Each structure stands twice: as structure tokens, then as C-alpha cells.
Amino acid sequence: MVFLSLKYALSGLAATAAAVPHANRNTCDNSSLNTTATTYTTTSEDTIFTVARKFDRGPCDIARYNRMIDAEHIFANFTLRIPPQVCNPDSTTCFLTRQNATATCLKGGPHDYRTIAGDTIEKIALYKLNMTVESVYENAKMGVSSIHEELPVNTFLKIPQCVPSVCHVTPFHFTYGVYKDIAEMFDTTVGQIMAFNGGYNYSESASDADAAWITVPTGCTNLALNVTEEI
């Protein structure tokens, strides 16, 4: 099953991740761990890092346990489930990383990207869509003076599409992880998954059976050697 493969792969990855600075458990006694799962309602002052420190957990363990779109996408009044402690808390592997993007159009689409809090042109291009900053900025300046300036929330950006190109889409039962994990598994981008699932942020459900089904684009490819960029 896809989910099992993803979860086991992440477990192996977490085993080699660096521990959170305040909780070095290099010589770990499983019997000393707090294995109680609880919930926590975030405040406007919280980040994934403050929550992790508060409960002595790995930020990535919390993000994946709550099936978040992005570990850093956290705001007031999120009801987060706090996972049991583990010997190797993960503080690194779930975060979006800057890509050395060369693409100037998006294979297969979609055409629109809806902004969320914290989005900038640079973050959308290099961290979420794996496209050059210039290709996104040219068509989505929206009055911002810098690629680092935060964009208004819930604004649709027109993203250049490669023509001709195609994506296939598949339903995916999102029972564990973050969008970065799914993007790596299906060889797609976080931004494309976000664009297909605009109403989803994270899951409060403790049950895998009640976890969300999301739409994942996969197999995105150009259909010709020479493509045009269309808005």
C-alpha cells in the first residue's frame, strides 16, 4: 500500500534526523518516554518550533502526525494532536527547501495557485513549484515591490503552463506525513498538490479511516521537445 510505504520510509528517515536541541536522546530509554498523545490549541504566538519545545517533541513528528500541508503553516486556533515521544525526534526532514529551479513553466498545470499566509514570490517559485522566480514574478507581481514581500492571502496567481504537457491525477488517502513527503513520492511539487487541494490545511482526526482523501498530480511531463509558455 502506498501509505504504508510512505510511513515506513519516513520512520527510517526520522531515525537518522537530528534531535531537537533541547531533547538530545542519543542514549534513549524507551521506558522513560512520554507515550501519551494529547491535543493543543495554538495561539497567535506559536510556531511549530515553540509547540515542539513545549511538549519536547520533534517539530516534524508533530507536523506529520497532523498531516500538515507545510510544517511552518501554523496559526492561531489550530487544534494539533501531539504524538507520543520517540527516541529520535525529527527536526529537519519535513521542511521545504530552496530548489535550484530552471523551469519557466509548469508541466501539466494547474493554471492557478491560491496564496496562503506567508507566501512570497520566492517561496512559491523556489520552494513550492520548482520554477524560476522570474517566471512567477512576471505574471504575478500584484503590486509587490520585492520577491520577498508577503502576498495577500487567498489571491489567485496565474502560473505559466508548458504547452503541450500533461499530468495524471490520483486520489491519495493522506493518513500521515506532510505535502513534501507526498511530492517526493509522486515526483511532483508541493505547490501543485496545494493547488489541487485548496481547502485543506491539516487534519484534526485521530483516526486514519477519517483522514482526508486528497488529489495528487503525478507523471507530469511535456508532450513535445519544444513547448510554449502559456498563461
From Swiss-Prot:
InterPro entries: LysM_dom (IPR018392), LysM_dom_sf (IPR036779). Residues 38-82 form the LysM domain. Its main location: secreted. It is found in: Secreted. It holds the Pfam family LysM. Glycans are attached at N30, N34, N77, N100, N130, N201, N226. Residues 1-19 form the signal peptide. GO terms for molecular function: chitin binding. Keywords: Chitin-binding, Glycoprotein, Secreted, Signal, Virulence. Disruption phenotype: Show no significant difference in the expansion rate of lesion diameters in apples fruits. Secreted LysM effector that might have a role in sequestration of chitin oligosaccharides (breakdown products of fungal cell walls that are released during invasion and act as triggers of host immunity) to dampen host defense. In plants, chitin acts as a microbe-associated molecular pattern (MAMP) that is recognized by lysin motif (LysM)-containing plant cell surface-localized pattern recognition receptors (PRRs) that activate a plethora of downstream immune responses. Belongs to the secreted LysM effector family. The LysM (lysin motif) domains are small globular domains involved in binding chitin in eukaryotes. LysM13 contains one LysM domain. This is Secreted LysM effector LysM13. The lineage of its organism: Eukaryota, Fungi, Dikarya, Ascomycota, Pezizomycotina.
